Amino acid sequence: MKKIIVAIDGYSACGKSTTAKILAAKLGYVYIDTGAMYRSVALYFIQHYINSTNPKAVAEALNQIHISFVHNNKTETCETYLNGLNVESEIRKMYVSEKVSEVSAIPEVRKRMVELQQKMARKRGVVMDGRDIGTHVFPDAELKIFMVADMHVRAFRRQQELFERKQIIDLDDIIKNIESRDLMDTTREESPLRKASDAYEIDTTYITVEEQVDCIMNIAVGKMIELEYNIENI
């Protein structure tokens, strides 16, 4: 049965990852968290004191990095592994968030991650979220979504997410971090964050995760019908 690629882009803390995970499960597709991949690289750079402005050091570091996703049968979630170690919790911490935009802006890092992402999705049937999936990684994706939300709502969501991970962070600090990431993501030279011309924009400010998923699910089914793909098992 033919399957499509669903590319979900947008700003941080708009609900991309949560929505993408649920959508993938409903479609029976593979979920690929590209944000976790860049966070893993950032974590490695922090742990090994890699100078991100030194091309030789960056290249050597990338050759030592192996990222994989492993399904946790107990939690029914996909967890991120860096060089064989589960880093799912560590990469979500604030100190990594403060580094990830800087690291992800490095051309060689993006090139290496994009190659890995394209390899992971070569058989299609994936839901992938990030910053440049629909514009750079898979410009030919059958369905492209671009998610936005109010800044303060995004900050509150991120604060709640961190609280659930037992991290108490002031809301103003989170707003500053998000504003900084937005600026770096939209102004970097290599694959900046932008909405693809054929992407559906969804404002998640006032809608629930369930409503987000239902909205994209309806668009996905409509797209598959348009392409005359089999949707009996969805």
From Swiss-Prot:
GO cellular component, one term: cytosol
Pfam families: Cytidylate_kin (PF02224)
Coiled coil: none
The organism's place on the tree of life at top rank: Bacteria
EC nos: 2.7.4.25
Substrates-to-products reaction catalysed: CMP + ATP = CDP + ADP; dCMP + ATP = dCDP + ADP
Binding site residues for ATP: G10, Y11, S12, A13, C14, G15, K16, S17, T18
GO molecular function: ATP binding; CMP kinase activity; dCMP kinase activity
Keyword Membrane appears in the UniProt entry: no
Signal sequence range: none
Enzyme category, top tier: transferase
Main location: cytoplasm
Localization terms from the record: Cytoplasm
Keywords: ATP-binding, Cytoplasm, Kinase, Nucleotide-binding, Transferase
GO annotation terms (biological process): nucleobase-containing small molecule interconversion; pyrimidine nucleotide metabolic process
SUPFAM superfamilies: P-loop containing nucleoside triphosphate hydrolases
Recorded family membership: Belongs to the cytidylate kinase family. Type 1 subfamily.
NCBIfam families: cmk
Protein name: Cytidylate kinase
Lineage start: Bacteria, Pseudomonadati, Bacteroidota, Cytophagia, Cytophagales
